[in-house]
Every structure is written in C-alpha cells, then in structure tokens.
C-alpha cells in the first residue's frame, strides 16, 4: 500500500498546476542516489533508466514533464547536440557503444510547471577482460542436488516487446550447446535451467544477447557468479522434555521447557508450540497469565536443539485441570508430548518447619543426658571410698 501511495503521489506531482505556482519549479528537490549501480562492459550498449520514471509510467507522464540528463553535476545537458553515441528515449539515456570515459554520475531531472526533482545513478564502464569479472558479476545461488534456474539480469530495456529472445550461455568461456543435458537454455526467455546441481557447477557464467541498431549488431553481456549452497536436510524431531508431571506450589512462578532434539537437521523448517486442552496458549489464557517464552535455537556437540518454554506467572488451581501439550512439526513428522501440573505436596513444607524444632529437642535432650550422667558419676565416686574396707573384710578369712 505504501508503494502504491508513493506511485500515485508521484504521478499526481507531474500533473500541470496553475501558473501561479511556477516559482516552485525553480528549486529542484534532490531525492538522492539510486540504490543500484550500473556496471557495464566497454563497447556494449547501455541504457540508463531515469530512476523517478519507470517504463510503465512513462507513457502517461511524458506529455506533462520535461526530462533532462546531466553528468557529474555539470550544467551542460547530455547528450550534446553533436553527440552521436548518446540519445534520450522513453525516459532512458542510451549509450551505444559505451566507453570507459562514460563512467560517472548521471543526474535525471524531471520538471513541470510546479514541480521539479532530480535523482542520480552511477555508471561504471569496465574493460572487457576477465580481470574485472568480480566487479561486474551478479551473484546467484543454487542448492546442491536440486534443479535450479539462472537468470540473465537487467535486459528489460533490450528485450521489451520481443518474443524471439535468443541468448547464448557460456561457462568459463565455453559455449553451452543445445544438446547439453545438464544445462538447458529456455527458449524465448532469459533463463538457463541447471539439472542436478553439483559443486563443480559453481563458477562464472556469461549470457550474451545480440542487439541490432541501425543495421549494426551489438553484444550485450551479463556475467553471473554461481554459488552452490548445501541442501539443508531435515530429520525427525524428538521431544526430550518436559516430564509427564510437574510439581508446583500454588502462587509460585513456574517455567516448563519444551526441548526438541533435531540432530543435524535444520531448525528453520521446524515449528514448535504449546497447547492447553488442545487450544493455543494465547486463546486458552487470553489474560496472559500463562504465556509461551521466546524460541531458542542452539547447538550442543554439533547437534541442533530448539526450545520453547511455557511460563506460569503465577500457578493457580485452574492450571491443575489443564492438559498441556508440547507440539513439534516439520515436513517429516508431527509429534506431541503431554504434561500436567500437580500441586506440590505439603509434607515437604512441614518438614522444613519441624526440622529446627527437632534439632532443638535433640540439643536439649543431649544436655539433659550429659547432666544426668555427670550426676551419677559423682555418686559412684562416693561409694568407692568404702569398697576397700569391705574387700579386706571379705578377702582374708580368719
């Protein structure tokens, strides 16, 4: 919607306004540099599209605006009157053929009676040698062991309204012939189909379109750097937690993790969530007392895990009657693991309270036993004074 609004406002800006506002056109608003830079080869055709005016918009706004081009902030417009390699057509600046000296910043200015803005676009023209491949190549990525498509980019200015597009494809300067079972150039398109992508398919590709102008043939070349990425393999996920029953005290805060083992599988395509009585947590607890925590993805010993916690803040009696499920799903499997919340036994809390009392009784009992033993020992010492007399009397008969 935002893009549509901007386009509508852009079209309305080109509508002629009353002459009373013509002073506004004297100051041009600079809208910045276009995000895309044009990297082209010397000796080939180049078409720079005015960034403010897409091709499909040109037909409707061209009668209402004046479009001019300047180079490197020069006051002189391009192309000049005597320039034969450059011309402006349908909102684009054409250079044929382009030379290295054409490199620079080109500013497109659109103006009517009440509105004026300008925007710049960068052009770099390189010598046509392999040394500049890293600078002029478009990176494209295909997945290993699959079939994919390479696209010859930025040819719309030269292929518009044409149904007989013929493109020749090269890999490392070798022409890919029609009988090649590995590579197939899709007729009438800018696509190259690559069957069963292998690691050795990586490298530089060139697509060449022949363009005719005033009876002369020109080549338009685009270079592509193909990068191969390994296919992300999926495995059957295994839920390793939570436990079947979780004990918690009413009024306490509780976190139950749902941990899933993926092995070497990718977590990107694995979904993990919680339910309560087969209902999503957000619906079962609209007040937000029980929520899902943030998803975590991590590795342990080069094996992948994902985890989503269920958070109670706090636990209430309502939770004791809920059937909670951890649910995991990917293209290979759908699994669930149930858990319930049980009120923690009160025995443990009474034990905590009674433990200090028991210890106190033991201490007091020990003190009492110590004093009693000491008292008995004192009595025993008094008796031993008499024992020698009794022993002498009994041991020696007359």
From Swiss-Prot:
A soluble form (sIL1R2) can also be produced by proteolytic cleavage at the cell surface (shedding) involving a metalloproteinase; hovever, several sIL1R2 forms ranging from 45 and 60 kDa are reported. The gene is IL1R2. Non-signaling receptor for IL1A, IL1B and IL1RN. Reduces IL1B activities. Serves as a decoy receptor by competitive binding to IL1B and preventing its binding to IL1R1. Also modulates cellular response through non-signaling association with IL1RAP after binding to IL1B. IL1R2 (membrane and secreted forms) preferentially binds IL1B and poorly IL1A and IL1RN. The secreted IL1R2 recruits secreted IL1RAP with high affinity; this complex formation may be the dominant mechanism for neutralization of IL1B by secreted/soluble receptors. It comes from the Eukaryota. It comes from Homo sapiens (Human). This is Interleukin-1 receptor type 2. The chain crosses the membrane at residues 344-369. Keywords: Cell membrane, Disulfide bond, Glycoprotein, Immunoglobulin domain, Membrane, Receptor, Repeat, Secreted, Signal, Transmembrane, Transmembrane helix. One of its GO terms (biological process) is cell surface receptor signaling pathway. Disulfide bonds join 28-116, 50-108, 152-207, 258-326.
């Amino acid at each position: 919607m935002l893009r549509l609004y901007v386009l509508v406002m852009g079209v309305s800006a080109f509508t002629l306004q009353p002459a009373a506002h013509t002073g506004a056109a004297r100051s041009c608003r600079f809208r910045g540099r276009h995000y895309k830079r044009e990297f082209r080869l010397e000796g080939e055709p180049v078409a720079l599209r005015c960034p403010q005016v897409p091709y499909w918009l040109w037909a409707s706004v061209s009668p209402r605006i004046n479009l001019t081009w300047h180079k490197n902030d020069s006051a002189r417009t391009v192309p000049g009157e005597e320039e034969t390699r450059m011309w402006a057509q349908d909102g684009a600046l054409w250079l044929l053929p382009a030379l290295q000296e054409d490199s620079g910043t080109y500013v497109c200015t659109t103006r009517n009676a009440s509105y004026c803005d300008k925007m710049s676009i960068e052009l770099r023209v390189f010598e046509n040698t392999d040394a500049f491949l890293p600078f002029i190549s478009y990176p494209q990525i295909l997945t290993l062991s699959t079939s994919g498509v390479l696209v010859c980019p930025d040819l719309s200015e030269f292929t518009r309204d044409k149904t007989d597009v013929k493109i020749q494809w090269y890999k490392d300067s070798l022409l890919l012939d029609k009988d090649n079972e590995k590579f197939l150039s899709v007729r009438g398109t800018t696509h190259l189909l690559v069957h069963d992508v292998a690691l050795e398919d990586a490298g530089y590709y060139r697509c060449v379109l022949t363009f005719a102008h005033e009876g002369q043939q020109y080549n338009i070349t685009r270079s592509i750097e193909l990068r191969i990425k390994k296919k992300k393999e999926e495995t059957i996920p295994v839920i390793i937690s939570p436990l079947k029953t979780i004990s918690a005290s009413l009024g306490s805060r509780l976190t139950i993790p749902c941990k899933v083992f993926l092995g070497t599988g990718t977590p990107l395509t694995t979904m993990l969530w919680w339910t309560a009585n087969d209902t999503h947590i957000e619906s079962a607890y609209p007040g937000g007392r029980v929520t899902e925590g943030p998803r975590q993805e991590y590795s342990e010993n080069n094996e992948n895990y994902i985890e989503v916690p269920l958070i109670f803040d706090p636990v209430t009696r309502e939770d004791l009657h809920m059937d909670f499920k951890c649910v995991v799903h990917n293209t290979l499997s759908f699994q669930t693991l149930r858990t319930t919340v049980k009120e923690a036994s009160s025995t443990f809390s009474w034990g905590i309270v009674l433990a200090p009392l028991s210890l106190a009784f033991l201490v007091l009992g020990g003190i009492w036993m110590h004093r009693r033993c000491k008292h008995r020992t004192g009595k025993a010492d008094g008796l031993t004074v008499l024992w020698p007399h009794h022993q002498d009397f009994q041991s020696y008969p007359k």
